[in-house]
Amino acid sequence: MPSVLIVDDEANVRRMVGALLSAEGYDVRDAGDGASGAARAEEAEPDLVLLDLMIPGALDGMAVLERLRRKFPDLPVIMMSGRAGLADAVKATRLGAVNFLEKPLTPEGVLLAMASALELRIARRERTALRADLGLAGQLVGESPAMDDLRAMIAQIGRAHV
C-alpha cells in the first residue's frame, strides 16, 4: 500500500488522519513541523504528502512545498489549512500542490483527494517511462553509432556507383 507523510503541527490532525489512513491500509508517518517534515520526506520518500499550510518554525507549508517540489518533482503534495484563503490555495497550486483541503477535514474529502493524487502520480511515472522508452527507441533506430556507420557506408556506395 502507498506510504503517506502527514505534516501538521496539530497532534489531533496527525492522529485522526493517521488512524483513518492506517485503517485504509496506508503506511503512515508524520511530523509536527516543517523542518522535520521535509527531512522525513527526504529520508522516507513517501508516495504522497499531506501538508499543513500554516505550520510554525523556520519552514512554513509553502517553503516545505517548494523544497519537496525541487527534490521530488513527481511527489503529490496535498495542502491543508483551516485559515487560508483563495489566494493561498492559488499560490500553493502554482507551486505544485495537487489539491488544497480546508479544515476541518472530512474522511471522504481526504480519501478522495488522496486517491486522485495517487492516480496522478502513477500517470506521471508512466509518462516519464514512456518518454524514456521513446527517447531510447529514437536513439536506437535513428541516432545510434551503428546507424551512422550504415549511412556513411550507403553514401560511399552511392558515390562509387555514380
Language-model region placement:
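Short amphipathic alpha-helix used as the core "switch/output" element in two-component signaling
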Residues: 39, 54, 59-74, 91
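Two-component/phosphorelay signaling modules centered on CheY-like receiver
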Residues: 11-29
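AAA+ ATPase active-site-proximal loops
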Residues: 131-161
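Short hydrophobic/Thr-rich beta-strand motif most characteristic of the beta2 strand and flanking loop
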Residues: 25-35, 39-40
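C-terminal output helix
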Residues: 85-87, 101, 105-114
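Active-site beta3 strand of CheY-like receiver
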Residues: 44-50, 55
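Active-site residues of response regulator receiver
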Residues: 8, 52-53, 81
